[in-house]
Amino acid sequence: MSQKPVNDGEIKTEYLQKVAIADDGSWVIGQLFYIHEDGGTWIVRYAPYSKEDRYGGEVVLAHGVDMSNLREGDLAYVRGEIIKESRASKYVGGPLYRASSVTLNERVD
């Protein structure tokens, strides 16, 4: 993966009014981040760190979904389900999320 980190994990200002999660977790709109530890993990961040949220503002994508057309920093629409409510990884605090689809909403610059 030849992508450079986009920032410190905070959502881009222009995305803040566009990110959200369904009450039942069936969809998430968020900014994509990539954690390189443990063979690589994709995070979908849908709330800023400053906002109180039951999942800490992020979900951790379970392996198996095709992310080849997406980049770190993109805004994406993700459909699926939370499959493990507790912390999914020792590196991040969000729950594990099984995505059935990930669609690009906006490409990072």
Predicted regions and their residues:
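Conserved RNA-binding domains used in RNP assembly and mRNA/RNA metabolism
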Residues: 1-109
